[in-house]
Amino acid sequence: MISLDLLLKHMQWANKEIYSEVSELDSKVLDYFVVDPEWKVKTIMLHIAKASNNYAQYLQGATEPTSLDLEEPLNSDDIKILIEKLYEIDQVLIDNQNIGDVDLTFITRRGEQTHKSSTVFSQMVFHAAEHRAQIVAALDKHNFRSINLDNYDVWSYIRAH
């Protein structure tokens, strides 16, 4: 059976690798979007990090998470800062994977919620994958096809490690 450890480490690796690839592209790609101009590449990149930051805090018992103090990246240097911060956040998630399937209660914009830690871990992994695909789709829409998601699947992670 696939392990949570593998899923989390794959997520951390895929986040870092895809963000690194985006950092090598012209900064104009940060303003690309698929359909909704509210969801530009730069917005999605920050959103993944902010959501992961919240998930990490929930898993550590925080009821109301402290917001991640970063802005949308405007250039390669900004992306590199975001890469480092997201890697650290993902490491917190990896380090907290053995908390057991406990109930976690936290406040979101939808009010107070209680979920099992397994639900939070599952949502976190899915959320990051969903939005990495959205980033690549926005680039693809504008004929930037250098990032192939098949290079960042679980198989590729296993081969690389």
Where do the protein language model's features map onto the residues?
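Helix-adjacent hinge/juxtasegments
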Residues: A62-G100
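Short, contiguous alpha-helical
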Residues: D5-S20, E24-D69, G111-H161
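Acidic catalytic patch
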Residues: Q97-G111
